A protein has these predicted regions:
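Early extracytoplasmic/domain-onset interaction patches
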Residues: 24-103, 525
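A surface-exposed beta-strand-loop module
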Residues: 25, 71, 80, 90, ...
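Beta/coil-rich, acidic/histidine-enriched accessory regions frequently appended to metallopeptidases
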Residues: 77, 549-795
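Short, hydrophobic/aromatic-enriched beta-strand segments in well-ordered soluble domains
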Residues: 85-87, 91, 104-106, 179-193, ...
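Glycine/proline-rich low-complexity spacer/linker segments in large multi-domain proteins
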Residues: 112-126, 188-249, 253, 274, ...
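Hydrophobic helix-coil surface modules that form long, contiguous segments used
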Residues: 221-235, 241-440, 469
Length: 795
């Protein structure tokens, strides 16, 4: 029992001693947030043989190809589209595929679609447009009707419709590494009235008082299309909910569109049977446009108005061919005038691109003046940043859709307005610049994502953000004072400090404040990256590298991030983390500026400086107001050495030490000690949390100024507060952060420091003294041996 008791006491003492030791060595850690930690291995996927670590396609990269042969008919009275397609699916993946997934995006307009049933509402009011839409769904329903699915031999195939997706089970799996299969599908759907139901396609009929009742039809997502099968996700079979757009494979198309005989058709690709659908005069004008310097009408406004006056009884079939495109869209109307202009690209080794616009009389004169010229301008600017435009046409169509893009064709909305009372035709400044801007934007989408084929349904910013950035560049090259809505750093501040933000890397259907998030913020981020972080030369080279690497391929965000870093040689993980993965904003405050002067090492000079600083101070208010004499003034016996000696006079000991210290300096150290420059120290505080370069404009007493660009790495050891130093022989009078408003700083009220700058003295730090036991023990060695010998001290 005694033994156990003693053992217990010993154990308790042992534990107590460990506890005391633990308390003694407990580590205290400073708060630290590493805004510069690497994304590689943390948030980015591991590189593979398909996508390498440099951001380029790997040596085993593959992608599928899907070819379509489609016959489609538009029934104008019923607004019904009926079609049949033969699909050839080429499987370049290493996987055998027993079934195919297709997109039925028109199924979004079924009453029981996931999109319709998952819509939410808020507030205590409702727009009349919402009321009209709700009423329309009571007696109308959209969506595909699939009437037949057969294989290449005509045998029926089993299929399943899952909301906006179609799964086709193949009789035999399509083999990987080059296998192919053929599928034939027949289908139909009712076109939506775009102004009532909304969406990216549909029809618009001119039925108001005084209008002719004719319609414009814009066809998009109008046929079952193959979903993407990729190396990083397999089948991209996410339902269409409206916001997240499209993820599609490249392929070759032949499309025959049967429409009323007096319609004019615009479509993806090149018209194959102009001799059957255009008059000889129209064909001649189309040929003239190839080398014209101004747009040429192919179908004149007079011809369009004549067609509007009567309804043809027959039909015509327009045949189009498009190679290596990811989608196909069309527009059809008897209201269309059509102008064209050949755009000759830099280098001159390619045929001209036919920039063409299709518009009703209600769009004139804005569209004749600006649409086709905006297309030509877009091709010039975007190609200078990326690659030559590879397709034969680029088209802009005016109709019910305000702005939407498809290969070689775009739908754009702005028009003039006619006064209901006077009939006068006018247009607003917003309509003018809105038309130019939307044409630039939608035609710009030919590059992103029609050619650099990103996954729109997953990452909105990859096409909308990149495209809006280039749109901003094109707008400023159209007119220096172009009223751009997105791209200027100052214009993103309101969003950056707003509530309910989500990171740019959020999946498209979950994005809040869609326009600001998917368009404006990434466009601004890229503007800042180009103008402030990387510089134009490095940025432009890296962006071009990305565009050319992923030309006609499927990039991911990580391919973009890696390419921008690998090409430029700049580590940008901090930038991607802040702008793309987070919701912090930019707000850097200049809290304090202090001038520091070097301690000269001369006691008399230092005394003189201290005396001068003291004399600048006001006397004690209390001492000044006291009227009676002090004890020291009335009693001489209280006055001693300290009363008689001048307060700042150096002592004899100080002078001796200074002389000794000076004698110990090397010539280089003595020159450094004699520097009379000012060391200005700036206290910077990161209020917003987003680390950014610090742009500092310094103004001096002689009227000169300079701008210092401090890289974002200044925050790498403390992301919240740092002190930065600037050495000059000039006198600083003013300091301002972000003088050109280039960083999207949210609070300019804390960016300026003016007025009196306090001066303090920097003491010269002595180098650390190294222990030398041999010297302290009065010993020495000789050059030829480690043997020690006596070395009596001379002290």
């Amino acid at each position: 029992m005694t033994t156990l008791f003693l053992r217990g006491c010993a154990a308790a003492l042992l534990l107590l001693s460990f506890g005391v030791q633990a308390d003694a060595i407990r580590q205290t850690k400073a708060p630290f947030e590493d805004k510069f930690r690497q994304l590689e291995g943390e948030d980015w996927p591991t590189p593979t043989d398909y996508r390498n670590a440099a951001g380029a396609p790997g040596y085993r990269y593959w992608q599928q190809q899907v070819d379509y042969d489609i016959q489609v008919r538009l029934d104008e009275p019923s607004k019904q589209v009926t079609g049949a397609e033969t699909v050839v699916y080429h499987n370049h993946s290493p996987d055998s595929l027993p079934y195919l997934w297709l997109l039925l995006d028109q199924n979004r307009f079924k009453r029981d679609s996931m999109d319709n049933l998952s819509r939410t509402v808020s507030g205590e009011s409702i727009s009349l447009g919402q009321v009209r839409r709700a009423k329309r769904y009571q007696d109308w329903e959209g969506g595909f009707t699939i009437t037949s699915v057969r294989d290449g031999n005509g045998r029926p195939l089993e299929f399943t419709v899952v909301d906006s997706l179609l799964r086709i089970d193949l009789a035999q799996p399509v083999a990987g590494n080059g296998g192919s299969t053929q599928v034939h599908i027949e289908w139909s759907f009712p076109m939506i009235e775009n102004k009532v139901v909304g969406g990216r396609s549909g029809y618009e009929c001119f039925t108001d008082k005084g209008q002719d009742g004719n319609c414009i039809f814009e066809g998009a997502q109008w046929f079952p299309r193959l979903a993407v099968y990729s190396d990083y996700e397999g089948w991209h079979n996410k339902a269409f909910l409206g916001s997240g757009e499209f993820t599609l494979e490249f392929g070759d198309y032949r499309v025959a569109l049967t429409v009323p005989a007096d319609h004019v058709v615009a479509a993806t690709g090149e018209l194959q049977n102009a001799d059957r659908v255009l008059s000889a005069a129209q064909r001649q004008r189309l040929a003239q446009a190839r080398d014209a310097t101004e747009p040429v009408f192919v179908v004149t406004p007079a011809e369009a108005e004549a067609a509007e006056g009567g309804r043809a009884s027959g039909e015509k079939t327009w045949v189009f061919k498009a190679d290596n495109v990811r989608d196909f869209a069309w527009a059809s109307s008897r209201k269309f005038a059509w102008d064209a202009l050949g755009v000759h690209q830099a280098g001159g080794d390619q045929p001209p691109v036919m920039a063409m616009s299709f518009f009703p009389k209600e769009a004139r004169p804005l569209w004749d003046a600006y649409s086709t010229k905006s297309i030509a301008h877009t091709l010039k600017v975007y190609s200078s940043f990326t690659f030559p435009y590879p397709y034969p046409t680029a088209q802009s169509v005016n109709g019910p859709v305000g702005g939407m893009e498809y290969p070689m064709i775009t739908f754009n909305g702005p028009r003039p307005v006619k006064d209901e009372k006077t009939g006068n035709l006018t247009y607003t400044e917003r309509a003018k610049y809105g038309l130019i801007g939307v044409v630039i934007h939608e035609v710009g989408h030919q590059y992103f994502p029609m050619i650099v084929n990103s996954d729109e349904r997953q990452w909105t910013w990859m096409d909308e953000g990149l495209n809006t950035f280039l749109q901003f560049q094109a707008e400023k090259q159209w007119d220096r004072d172009f009223p751009s809505r997105r791209g200027e750093p100052k214009d993103i501040v309101e969003y950056m400090v707003s509530q309910d933000q989500v990171p740019l890397m959020t999946q498209s259907d979950s994005v809040l404040q869609f326009g600001a998030n998917g368009y404006a913020k990434p466009a601004t981020a890229l503007t800042i990256l180009r103008e402030t972080v990387m510089g134009r030369e490095l940025f432009d080279r890296a962006l071009r590298e990305y565009a050319q690497r992923w030309y006609m391929k499927h990039p991911t965000p990580y391919d973009f991030f890696r390419t921008m870093e690998e090409s430029s040689g700049i580590d940008l993980d901090w930038f991607w983390r802040g702008w793309f993965y987070g919701t912090d904003h930019v707000d850097i405050a200049l809290d304090q500026v202090v001038r520091w002067r070097l301690d000269s090492g001369n006691p008399d000079a230092e005394a003189s400086w201290s005396r001068g600083e003291y004399q600048k101070e006001p006397p004690s208010l209390t001492a000044t107001r006291n009227t009676g004499k002090t004890v020291v003034e009335t009693d001489p016996a209280t006055r001693d050495y300290y009363d008689r000696a001048e307060r700042f006079a150096p002592t004899a000991s100080a002078r001796r030490k200074a002389k000794k210290d000076d004698a110990a300096l090397s010539p280089e150290e003595r020159r450094a000690r004699a520097v009379s420059d000012s060391f200005y120290r700036f206290d910077l505080r990161n209020v917003g949390g987003l680390v950014m370069p610090v742009i500092l404009k310094l103004t001096f007493s002689d009227g000169s100024d300079t701008v210092v660009r401090i890289p974002a790495e200044v925050w790498r050891k403390n992301a919240r507060q740092v002190t930065w130093e600037y050495v000059t022989d000039k006198t600083l009078t003013r300091a301002e952060l972000d003088p050109l408003w280039e960083t999207a700083d949210a609070d300019r009220g804390n960016n300026l420091f003016t007025g009196t700058i306090a001066t303090r003295t920097l003491k010269i730090a002595s180098p650390p003294k190294q222990d030398n036991r041999m010297r302290e023990d009065d010993l020495k060695v000789l050059p030829d041996s480690l043997q020690t010998y006596p070395a009596p001290s001379k002290d």
